[in-house]
Structure formats: structure tokens, C-alpha cells
Amino acid sequence: MRMNPTTSSSGVATLDKKNLGRIAQIIGPVLDVAFPPGKMPNIYNALVVKGRDTVGQPINVTCEVQQLLGNNRVRAVAMSATDGLTRGMDVIDTGAPLSVPVGGATLGRIFNVLGEPIDNLGPVDNSTTFPIHRSAPAFIQLDTKLSIFETGIKVVDLLAPYRRGGKIGLFGGAGVGKTVLIMELINNIAKAHGGVSVFGGVGERTREGNDLYMEMKESGVINEQNIAESKVALVYGQMNEPPGARMRVGLTALTMAEYFRDVNEQDVLLFVDNIFRFVQAGSEVSALLGRMPSAVGYQPTLSTEMGSLQERITSTKEGSITSIQAVYVPADDLTDPAPATTFAHLDATTVLSRGLAAKGIYPAVDPLDSTSTMLQPRIVGDEHYETAQQVKQTLQRYKELQDIIAILGLDELSEEDRLTVARARKIERFLSQPFFVAEVFTGSPGKYVGLAETIRGFQLILSGELDGLPEQAFYLVGNIDEATAKAMNLEMESNSKK
């Protein structure tokens, strides 16, 4: 979708000072502002409050109009803390939605929801800006090619492959490894594909945001010597921000990604961590605006808000945005309205399992719950499809036999079932993999495994060629050759102990 970027320097100096309102009421992050008759701002217009607090410190708060109340009043949601604001303060209507800087100048930098740099590296060239509220590309502009996006992570590439220009969800409860998986994907994609990424930190921990920034500087994804050579732009609206900022920070990140797609005609990666916090912030704002809550206390506009964000993430004939979104699952309940609404938009789902994490199998991706629309013979080829189906069948049979094993033990199984269980346990361990970004914690060097190597490895396990190897040889290795080498080392160690 082509849109001419606006070329103007942002700031209040260029604002029409005539359209002034006054704060009539402040309730937390929500402001009611009275304007002169006939001078009402439009929905989504940015309002700016400038002044000084009671101690004389300067205040500069940007708000977004959400409701027109009548009696020449509007209700707006603040994008930053409202501390120090008082009734009667002047409010300037900017006459336009929030606009953020876009283009090459954003690479290697960290921004807040307003597009202001927060990394203490000086101002950003904001001669080119885009409004954060934009319509999705027209149907005729969409690109419908189907191709696989290789990640180098075995369990993902084999069982739930990602679509280039598609939307992928990482589902998991607290502490099962969503953010680590996202960091690994950024690392692998920057190294293997050299693509540009935009990372939207929506309502997550500030510490994780800082860790990610440091990690990117160490791995060279952000080039400290020459910032312009960096491969990623970061947009943060963390847990401590007001709900307005957390609700809009995803749109800011998406707007920056859209510029790379539409104007630079690039393939972009958009990471959102965490899309649930976008819904949560929308729920808080909805309650503050006095809307009647719907199921489980969520906002009545949940599907609309999610749709307006997700429909902008797509491939056009100019370029593509491949989006990988972490989805926190409240109380591990996938039927909760927030994850359930997200499911409808996704091409692939990577479900993280607490059971696998407890066994120490990382990435803790559930091979049976994770799905992908790309796993079809006409897209991935017969060999890949057959291998993936056999792996799933073996693991499913193992899952069915677990109750019998728990009650009666392995000895009561038939010879065929015992062989299935042995192979399934090897497959389960071979689906684990050492990550580059976790090297500092695990001490094992990270591994990138190509798709052909992955398929070959699982075919060897399924064929029975490796039935004689111990299952621990398959744990936390890269390709199958490393597993056989590890088995030889284990055998030598056990012989030397004897």
C-alpha cells in the first residue's frame, strides 16, 4: 500500500495555537478536555498538554482523543504519566493523529510510543513521519504466494513451519520461554537472511527489554560503531507505562515496519512481545472510558481492535511483513477470549508446554499442539510432509501409552509399542536444541539446523537405524551427526568408568 509520508519536523512549534482547550477533569490516565464551540478535535487526534507543575518542573503530556462527549467536551487517554496536571491547564489540538519517524533513521534506536528516542543517543532525523492510524492494504494489493520461512529451529521447521509474510503466534504461560524463542529468531534471521526487523515491546518487563538491547549489541544486530548498519528498530512501551501507551505501542512498531515494506519494498520481520498486553491495555482503557465489559471482563471491542492491528500485518506486491507474536495465555487457558481471538488471525501457532519445560526440553514447543497452515504436501513437498506426520504419529502413540506405562510399566507393552516408545523418547529429546542467545546460561554453543538436515535426522530415527543409541545422546544437540558423536562419547565415558 503506497502512502506518501508526511515531511515535516514534529513538535508543538508548528501546531495551530488557536485551537486551545482546557482540562476539565482528570481521572488517572483519562482526561476530559473542554474546547470552544465548533472547534472540536476528531477521534484519534493527538492533544498536547504543556505547562509547569506545582514545583515548576516542565510538563509535556501527549493524549489521544477517544470519545466526543457532547457539551464541547472530549475524553482523551494520556500516553505518559499524568502526574502534575491540574484542571484548567491549556491543551493544544494538533489537528492530526500521532505521527512517528520512519525509515533508515529508526534502525539501531529505541523509541517510545510517541516515536521519541529513549536510548540517550541524541535526536532522530524525523523529516519523514507516518501517522500510526492507517488503513490496511486494499485486497487487490495483497500478495498470495506461499513459501516457507526457515528459522533454523528443528521443531518449528519440521512440525509447524512459518510462512513468509505470515502471522505466527507463540503461545505459553509465564516463564516457559516465549521471549527467549523470540530473541533466538531475531538472532537467526539477522544472521541467515540479513533482513530488517522491528521489535515491539508491548507491556513486558523493562529488564527483558534492556537484556534484549544488550544482547543485540553483543551479537551485532545493532551496530554500535555505525548505527545505520543496524538490522533492527526497537519500540518499547513496558509494564510501568500507562495503558494508553501500551495500547498504542504496537501500532507505532507496525507503522515503522509498514514503511520498510511499502516505501523501501523490503521483507520485514515484526516481533510483538506480548500481544496479550495489547489486549490487556485495551481492556483497561475500555473500563476507564466507561464501556460495559464483555466476557471475562474484556472490552466489548476486542475483536475489532485485534482485527485493525492484525489486518495491517500482511504481504503486498511491494514487500512483506512476517510477524511473530508472543501470546501470554492467562492461567494456561487457551480458551480465554484474548488468546482465542488471536488464534483466528494466525497462519502458524507455536505452543509452548510447561510439561516439556519441566522435563528440561528447550525450546519447550509442544509438537502435537503446534500447528501450521503451511504443512501441506503441495507446499513443503512429500518428503517433509511424510516425515512430519510420522513424527506426530509416533509422539501421539507415546502419549496414549503413557497411562498404561504409569500403571503397569514398560514390560506390559507389546514389542512394537516398546519400540515406538523408545523412538518417541529419542524424537522428544532430538526436538530440543541449544540456542545462541542462551549460550551464557547453558554453556553449550548455539546451533542453526537447516531444514534438509532436520528432515534427514528424523528420518534416521524413524527408520530404526539409531535404535541402538542411548536417548540422552539426542538431548540438546544440533543435527543428527552430533547425536551419533555424543553417543560414542557417552559409550567411551561409561567404558572408562568400568
Swiss-Prot record:
It is found in: Plastid, Chloroplast thylakoid membrane. ATP binds at residues 172-179. Its EC number is 7.1.2.2. Keywords: ATP synthesis, ATP-binding, CF(1), Chloroplast, Hydrogen ion transport, Ion transport, Membrane, Nucleotide-binding, Plastid, Thylakoid, Translocase, Transport. Gene3D superfamilies: 2.40.10.170, Bovine Mitochondrial F1-atpase, Atp Synthase Beta Chain, Chain D, domain 3 (1.10.1140.10), P-loop containing nucleotide triphosphate hydrolases (3.40.50.300). It is a peripheral membrane protein. CDD domains: ATP-synt_F1_beta_C (cd18110), ATP-synt_F1_beta_N (cd18115), F1-ATPase_beta_CD (cd01133). Disulfide bonds: none annotated. Pfam families: ATP-synt_ab, ATP-synt_ab_N, ATP-synt_VA_C. GO terms for molecular function: ATP binding; ATP hydrolysis activity; proton-transporting ATP synthase activity, rotational mechanism. It catalyses: ATP + H2O + 4 H(+)(in) = ADP + phosphate + 5 H(+)(out). It is an enzyme of class 7 (translocase). InterPro entries: AAA+_ATPase, ATP-synt_VA_C, ATP_synth_F1_bsu, ATPase_a/bsu_AS, ATPase_alpha/beta_chains, ATPase_F1/V1/A1_a/bsu_N, ATPase_F1/V1/A1_a/bsu_N_sf, ATPase_F1/V1/A1_a/bsu_nucl-bd. Coiled coil: none annotated. One of its GO terms (cellular component) is proton-transporting ATP synthase complex. The keyword Glycoprotein does not apply. Belongs to the ATPase alpha/beta chains family. Produces ATP from ADP in the presence of a proton gradient across the membrane. The catalytic sites are hosted primarily by the beta subunits. F-type ATPases have 2 components, CF(1) - the catalytic core - and CF(0) - the membrane proton channel. CF(1) has five subunits: alpha(3), beta(3), gamma(1), delta(1), epsilon(1). CF(0) has four main subunits: a(1), b(1), b'(1) and c(9-12). This is ATP synthase subunit beta, chloroplastic. The gene is atpB.
